[in-house]
Amino acid sequence: MPDLTTPEVKKLLAFRGYGNPSGRFWFVGMEEGGGDFESLQIRADEFANLEDIATSHAKFESHDMSKSISTWRIMSAIVGRISGTENWWETACTTNYQMNRLGRLNDETYLTEILPLPKRSLSDWPYGNFFDSPKSYFEQIFPAQLASLRLEYSESKSKPEFVFCYGKKYWPFHKKIFESIDFESALDDRILWGQNHSTIFVLTNFFGYGWTGFGENFVEKLCQFVLSKS
């Protein structure tokens, strides 16, 4: 881990996400990947609280927005299918959206996380100088993050039409953010969903291909279901 100062860690903790909170689509994960030395120091030195995903990640020498990344590809496919884009599942289509529109400040998507500090993996813990353990970090940070995300939703200039919270392990925390929503299961218990007067909320597995099941057929079923409720 880089020798981050306390003010730098506080800056990392204040990070909100990528894109437009007033956009049509929200994607809410648990925590962002990428807690290596390079990315942490760049984030601490150069990131604002809200970033454009393409311009901010261009600061990482190791990153390439033209490379198809499973999580972002599935986000792009969901947006494409709901928006009626032709060939929405094809890699060329999702990569083009990923490169040019996903997580852009003045566009239609907002990518945020329950926890603000990035990690390379679930077992990785590069913040031992500031938090005793991941459990201690969660207990200290989650209440403020919970309040922040609730406020961000309530104060968004126009409410998102669709909020996708991904990572089944974290459904209880996603449900706490949107505690006024009555969620029910659908698609053979593979999702939870609910809605208010302006937004459809969907809780899913993690956005990946293998056991999480986000192939073309499931994304088609998911989007058909969501569109039937809108």
Give the predicted meaning of each segment.
Residues 1-6, 131-150, 169-230:
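C-terminal capping/extension of enzyme domains
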Residues 86-87, 162, 182:
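Secondary-structure boundary/capping signal
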Residues 23, 158-161, 195-200:
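A short helix->loop->beta-strand "cap" motif at the edges of active sites that frequently abuts
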Residues 1-158, 207:
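A polyanion-binding, active-site-adjacent surface
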Residues 28-29, 160-174:
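Glycine-rich anion-binding loop/nest that anchors nucleotide
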